Design a protein with these regions (language model features):
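Surface-exposed, charge/polar-rich loops and edge strands
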Residues: 1-351
Length: 351
């Protein structure tokens, strides 16, 4: 398939620059992945499209203040963007300007934090070894900036609005944005109706924004991300699958985690790197339904949601969303790609 097969026209004004307040007042486009039936609702209506026994899987990662500013011994200013933690002191990073930061270069960020470039990565980045006094996470909170996606140009007043309400595992360079719509009250309502929830962790990297540069989508080199699944989460998912209950992934990062850990048909507990690449023709093992935002044209995430339904249905759904003036991308509205919508566009848990 060609990357242009996943293109669509999006007016610039449809790109959301600010998060919706309250969180769950975003709009929700519900679409049946088999029939194409659609419903236009708000996110607080999501429980109406869930069934008792559904298992919702959330990514509990937290976005870190990944952008650091420092200077070399020469006084030259540099920018370091944290991507992946390798151990207590070493990180894979992006640097700017790259030519000024070769192996051996030292960077001073503050009195309590400095770093030395010790290697190159296979994606044009660097490996930096930090030296610090105190707790690294606390230093990072003081010195770093939380990065926003490049298509968001407005200033974000409350940085917690780029975090989910259930975040607890720092490590991401970008938010798992489907989760931004949930409030604590909505989560409780979903639990009270008999749904189950579990949490997995995938540290979202900047690769999530990397454009597909190859003409044929099959030739695209997929970025890697680190994920973790606890034994309790794996057991809950496998039990739900065995009992015929729906697995509802909250966000594409939850999808990547579940389908990576469940590549053999059953989810395995543990931590690992994944370069899973999901596009039409993918053989699904775990995920039945998906809560997700609207994704960029020609992106791997648009390919992923197309794999769960079909390319034609997703492009039709996106065209409908543009026409109906939905808000797009990280701070935008949401979709629920599901099953069980009957001819009246109502949920039918007994189908």
């Amino acid at each position: 398939m060609k990357v242009t097969d996943f293109d669509y026209a999006l007016p610039k004004e449809r790109i959301a620059q600010h998060p919706m307040e309250p969180r769950d007042h975003s709009r929700l486009l519900v679409v049946d992945k088999h029939t194409g039936a659609m419903e236009h609702r708000h996110f607080y209506d999501l429980p109406q499209y869930l069934c008792p026994g559904d298992l919702l899987v959330f990514n509990d990662t937290r976005v870190i203040p990944a952008r650091l500013y420092g200077y070399k011994d020469t006084g030259a200013h540099v920018e370091v963007f944290l991507l992946t933690r390798l151990n207590n002191t070493d990180w894979e990073v992006l640097v700017r300007p790259g030519k000024k930061l070769q192996v051996g270069a030292c960077v001073k960020f503050a009195e309590e934090l400095s770093g030395t470039i010790i290697g190159h990565t296979d994606f044009g980045g660097r490996i930096i070894r930090f030296a610090f006094e105190g707790v690294f996470e606390e230093i990072l909170d003081r010195l770093g900036e939380v990065p926003l996606p490049p298509y968001i140009t407005a200033e974000l007043e409350d940085k917690e609005r780029y975090q989910t309400v259930y975040n607890r595992d720092p490590g991401s360079a970008a938010a798992p944005t489907a989760g931004l719509h949930f409030t604590k009250e909505l989560l409780q309502k979903i639990k009270d109706m008999g749904c189950e929830e579990v949490f997995v962790t995938l540290n979202v990297g900047l690769g999530t924004f990397r454009p597909v540069t190859e003409e044929n989508i099959e030739d695209h080199p997929m970025h890697r991300e680190f994920y973790s699944v606890t034994p309790e989460a794996a057991a809950a998912v496998n039990r739900a699958k065995a009992e015929g209950r729906r697995i509802v992934a909250v966000g594409t990062t939850a999808v990547r985690t579940l389908e990576s850990a469940g590549a053999t048909g059953a989810v395995k507990a543990g931590s690992s790197w994944t370069q899973i690449y999901i596009y039409p023709g993918f053989q699904w093992h775990i995920v039945d339904a998906l809560v997700t935002n609207f994704h960029l044209p020609q992106s791997t995430l648009l390919m992923l949601v197309s794999a769960l339904s079909s390319r034609e249905l997703m492009l039709h759904t996106y065209a409908t969303a543009v026409k109906e003036k939905y808000r797009f991308f990280s701070f935008g509205d949401a979709m629920f790609i599901t099953t069980l919508l009957n001819s009246k566009k109502e949920i039918s848990c007994t189908q």
